[in-house]
């Protein structure tokens, strides 16, 4: 049996923390950076006005708000890590479905776009509500404020980088 010093939770950047921060950076850079910009440009290109764009974005956010307390209530039964992976799957699945909406016409297209965005943000809600409790279990109490600080700094930094990338992408592919 190893000593207390061998416990990975005694290390600030242990494997779980590194994996979490990497996933958080990818999610923040893509979802809050590139995806946010490209989604609105995509909807404009499809001919939708600001009212529909507001509806689509609002539907995603309300689904996030609904999913968060439900996921939080289920965390003890299902587990933080598993729920975070389920949430990431929702983000990937919903954002992957979004572009296929361009193949439809009329109401079907609008419903597809709103529902796929809602799936994306439902997944985000499930992920984000479980991330801090997950992080609490990855390090000892005296390191938690440092890990939370790193986590908090990761989101806007990655979102900023993703926004820059998202702003350049249309020019590269137009």
Identify what each model region corresponds to.
Residues 4-62:
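Helix-loop boundary and gating motifs at the non-cytosolic
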Residues 67-80:
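Helix-to-loop junctions at the C-terminal end of transmembrane segments
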Residues 89-107:
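C-terminal ends and interior cores of transmembrane alpha-helices
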Residues 25, 94, 107-127:
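Hydrophobic core of transmembrane alpha-helices in multi-pass small-molecule transporters
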Residues 161-174:
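Transmembrane alpha-helix termini and helix-breaking/packing motifs in multi-pass membrane transporters
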Residues 116-155:
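Cytoplasmic helix-loop-helix junction between adjacent transmembrane helices
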Residues 61-69, 159-160:
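Residue-level signature of mid-helix packing/kink "hotspots" within the transmembrane helices
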């Amino acid at each position: 049996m190893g000593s207390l010093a061998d416990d990975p939770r005694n290390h600030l950047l242990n494997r779980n923390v590194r994996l979490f921060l990497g996933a958080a950076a990818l999610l923040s850079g893509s979802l809050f950076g590139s995806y946010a910009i490209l989604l609105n440009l995509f909807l404009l290109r499809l001919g939708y006005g600001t009212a529909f764009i507001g509806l689509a974005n609002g539907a995603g956010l309300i689904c996030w708000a609904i999913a968060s307390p439900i996921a939080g209530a289920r965390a003890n039964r299902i587990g933080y890590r598993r729920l975070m992976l389920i949430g990431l799957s929702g983000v990937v699945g919903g954002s992957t479905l979004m572009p296929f909406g361009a193949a439809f016409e009329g109401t079907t297209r609008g419903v597809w776009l709103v529902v796929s965005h809602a799936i994306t943000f439902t997944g985000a809600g499930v992920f984000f509500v479980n991330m801090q409790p997950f992080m609490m279990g990855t390090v000892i109490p005296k390191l938690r404020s440092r890990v939370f600080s790193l986590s908090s700094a990761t989101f806007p930094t990655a979102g900023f980088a993703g926004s820059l990338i998202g702003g350049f992408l249309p020019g590269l592919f137009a």
